[in-house]
Amino acid sequence: MHLHFTPRQIVEKLDQYIIGQKDAKKAVAVALRNRYRRSKLAENLRDEIAPKNILMIGPTGVGKTEVARRMAKLVGAPFIKVEATKFTEVGYVGRDVESMVRDLVETSVRIVKEEMVVKVQDKAEEQANQRLVEILVPSPEKQSGFKNPLEMLFGGAQNSNQTSDTQEDVEIEKKRQDVERKLAAGLLEEEIVSIEVTEQQSSMFDMLQGTGMEQMGMNFQDALGSFMPKKTKKRKLSVKEARKLLTNEEAQRLIDMDEVTQEAVYRAEQLGIIFIDEIDKIAGKQSNSVDVSREGVQRDILPIVEGSNVATKYGSVKTDYILFVAAGAFHMSKPSDLIPELQGRFPIRVELTKLSTDDFVKILIEPDNALIKQYMALLATEGIEIEFSDEAIRKIAEIAYQVNQDTDNIGARRLHTIMEKLLEDLSFEASEITLEKITITPQYVEEKLATIAKNKDVSQFIL
């Protein structure tokens, strides 16, 4: 966990991936730092301080989800994103709101398990190599030297067998030492071996997914799993692939699942972040029977956000200290349309601004994972070096901004399809082009995207 970052450092880290939206970055940075501050308090005071949940308001594609996701990744906190529209009021068919907490705990278990596996990786690989040696040089089946029951009683023929067994064991040990040396030197990586691996069984309870009955299915499956033996099957693999599978199996045996569960539940409770998207879709006054469950979903979410105990297969989980970040465009409704009790549980409100042409220019070139860098890397695999002139980048940004203005504003996502359209012919012909270097100019951009920029009817089909 990396809770030691200062708010300024957190904002600087987020700036590497997200352009603009300073207010949102500051809000999440302070929320994260407050978790660190809370961890330093005396226990009696620590229990009194709950995180201040955040409501992000802004159109699609401006970075609401990305801010929360990058924040969680930065500190290694368990994080899940859910859509408010996927939940239904208790009593209706669909997912109940408590499933978001169960999903968070599952994510936390996965994170902790991966960390534990890394810690035991060396020992697991050592044991996997030992198993490979035993597979490559198997022990001979011991045959009984007794020919009749009387020899078992009086020990006849045993001494001669012991001598031959000892000689055979010495020879096998020599062979194994030789194989160990070759394995360490990487000389047997392509050798084919036959190993037994635990078979991954598809769950008969997968059909319950999305019905609100997943938890019941998982609990029943776990109960059955403790009685049913695990199935294994033989697979023929190269030593290199077999080592990966065997190392994973050994690592699973070495980690203590009770310790994993305990740490995972603690992290979910104290450090977990739940991002509730499209919360504006469940806001608004009930006007017809279709909207009947909107307020019901809000009232079901309320106790989770307020703080309650949710039953999971890993035990009861308290939601009092989970940070909730809700987001919505609020085109058709406004935050005040949420029920007052739920509004009060999101005291920090941040409005994200629409992206300008200058923002689009920065998005194209500045982030570590900038779009232009991605396309340059993709085409470089074909031996083609492409570069974009500053004027061409500005032209792309202007067209993306204009299409957003003329049609639906989908924010930075517009750049993805604009770039795809721009480089469509080049990507198609890349494997046949003999040129090693291509420069994208404003004229090239104009030629490829002119119809989109000028024709409103056409631009509606460019997402």
From Swiss-Prot:
Keywords: ATP-binding, Chaperone, Cytoplasm, Nucleotide-binding. GO terms for cellular component: HslUV protease complex. Its main location: cytoplasm. The keyword Flavoprotein does not apply. ATP binds at residues 19, 61-66, 277, 341, 413. It comes from the Bacteria. SMART domains: AAA, ClpB_D2-small. Pfam families: AAA, AAA_2, ClpB_D2-small. InterPro entries: AAA+_ATPase (IPR003593), ATP-dep_Clp_protease_ClpX (IPR050052), ATPase_AAA_core (IPR003959), Clp_ATPase_C (IPR019489), HslU (IPR004491), P-loop_NTPase (IPR027417). One of its GO terms (molecular function) is ATP hydrolysis activity. A double ring-shaped homohexamer of HslV is capped on each side by a ring-shaped HslU homohexamer. The assembly of the HslU/HslV complex is dependent on binding of ATP. ATPase subunit of a proteasome-like degradation complex; this subunit has chaperone activity. The binding of ATP and its subsequent hydrolysis by HslU are essential for unfolding of protein substrates subsequently hydrolyzed by HslV. HslU recognizes the N-terminal part of its protein substrates and unfolds these before they are guided to HslV for hydrolysis. This is ATP-dependent protease ATPase subunit HslU. It comes from Bacillus cereus (strain B4264). The gene is hslU.
